């Protein structure tokens, strides 16, 4: 992607959502990480300053967080 800084975090799958949020925002200060339960409807727009963290009912990351 053409967004500045780190853009994906595949190693965070299985980690707690709040831990993942802290790591992502520390590694790329340009983004705001948002924790969402899988299945939550979201907009389809692409934004360089957003990372969606998809978690299951136990709050664990279920897919690699990435910019968008």
Curated annotation (Swiss-Prot):
Q: Which Gene3D superfamilies did the record assign?
A: Trypsin Inhibitor V, subunit A
- The positions annotated as site (Reactive bond) read 44-45
Q: List the disulfide bonds.
A: 3-48
Which residues, if any, are the signal sequence? Answer: none
Query: What SUPFAM superfamilies does UniProt report for this protein, alphabetically?
Result: CI-2 family of serine protease inhibitors (SSF54654)
Q: Which UniProt keywords apply?
A: Acetylation, Disulfide bond, Protease inhibitor, Serine protease inhibitor
Q: Which residues carry this modification: N-acetylserine?
A: 1
Q: Which Pfam families would you find in this protein's record?
A: potato_inhibit
An individual GO BP term:
response to wounding
One of the record's GO molecular function terms: serine-type endopeptidase inhibitor activity
Q: Where does the source fall among the domains of life?
A: Eukaryota
Family in the record: Belongs to the protease inhibitor I13 (potato type I serine protease inhibitor) family.
What does it do? Specifically inhibits both trypsin and activated Hageman factor.
Mind telling me what this protein is named?
A: Inhibitor of trypsin and hageman factor
Taxonomic lineage: Eukaryota, Viridiplantae, Streptophyta, Embryophyta, Tracheophyta
């Amino acid at each position: 992607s053409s967004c500045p800084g780190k853009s994906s975090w595949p190693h965070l799958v299985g980690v707690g959502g709040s831990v993942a949020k802290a790591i992502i925002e520390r590694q790329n200060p340009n983004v705001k990480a948002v924790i969402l339960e899988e299945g939550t409807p979201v907009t389809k727009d692409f934004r360089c300053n957003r990372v969606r963290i998809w978690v299951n009912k136990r709050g664990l990351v279920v897919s690699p967080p990435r910019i968008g």
